[in-house]
């Protein structure tokens, strides 16, 4: 179990603690990317909204890769 905390900022500027970086990254990859790039779609989680831009996706990918 990974005890490291990961946070992202929602579209309206609120800080969101990612409960499980593995599931979060997998969902973004499966549903909000095309050819490994953020596709500018909208991801909603627990009332927080995130536009999955290239920068947003890469920042989450960096967090995911840092857990190793």
Language-model segment annotations:
Residues 2-3, 62-68:
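Short acidic DE-rich linear segments
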Residues 9-61:
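Acidic, low-complexity, intrinsically disordered interaction modules
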């Amino acid at each position: 179990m990974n005890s490291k905390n990961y946070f992202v900022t929602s579209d309206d500027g609120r800080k969101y603690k990612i409960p499980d970086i593995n599931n979060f990254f997998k969902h973004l990859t499966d549903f909000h990317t095309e050819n490994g790039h953020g596709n500018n779609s909208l991801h909603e989680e627990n009332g927080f909204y995130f536009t999955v831009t290239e920068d947003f996706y890469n920042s989450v990918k960096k967090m995911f890769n840092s857990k190793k």
